[in-house]
Amino acid sequence: MKLTLHGHDDRYAVEQLQLSLFPDNTEGEAVSSLHRGKVWLTAVTKITVNGTTAAATRRIKAADETVRLRRRALQQSYYLAAKQLLPVTPPWGALAGVRPTKITTKHLLEGGTPKSADELLRDVYYVTDDRRRLAVDCSVSTVRAVNMLQPSDLSLYVGIPFCPTRCTYCSFVSRTIGRKTELLEPYLRALEQEIAVTGRLLYRDSAKETVLTSNFRLFSVN
């Protein structure tokens, strides 16, 4: 789908949402415009697919403009226009290119409640009921785990370069497994070896009491 911008250059913010909502190279055109007034900053999106055009508008106060709020308004207007042309409501709403729990976990860590996190996903990102419950439940568990960490603990991130399928909100999946399932087992074996080696490097009884000592609880290396 062709994407044209007027009045702004936030292409990535709009394009990643377009890739999520219209992933199959849909024939059509989308125009994302930003109009600056003295009081309001107005985002307008018009999308034409198969001869049918839909439009939507979102605005923020010009005095409140930040990069985040501007991009949010652009994405909201795009989503609300696209929703009118889609056969089903996207379960993850206007989310694109992010982990849904990243938003809700950050909200909870900053003092928000599960209820306000749910409202954030509903009112800002238009996420459906069941997906909101899933995201908030995951974030509550994440925050609980974070609060259990001690000074001698360590949180390790393991990157996975492929996914079983492409999530509906994702605009940058590295690679779906597809016909490459034969690579899964050797990759997991290599990953297990790397985790074991990393564990041995972190688990040093002779070191002082840091994350490199026997007090480190998240690894158990044989």
Model-derived segments and their meaning:
Residues T53-Q75, L85:
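Short secondary-structure boundary motifs at beta->alpha junctions and helix caps
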Residues L86-W92, L109-L156:
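N-terminal [4Fe-4S]-dependent radical SAM core
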Residues S77, P186-V197:
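A non-catalytic, amphipathic alpha-helix used as a structural packing/dimerization or gating element
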Residues D153-L188:
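Canonical Radical SAM [4Fe-4S] cluster-binding loop centered on the CxxxCxxC motif
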Residues V31-A62:
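Amphipathic beta-strand/beta-sheet edge segments enriched in Tyr/Trp
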Residues M1-V31:
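Short Lys/Arg-enriched alpha/beta "domain-start" segment
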Residues Q193-N222:
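Conserved SAM/AdoMet-binding glycine-rich loop
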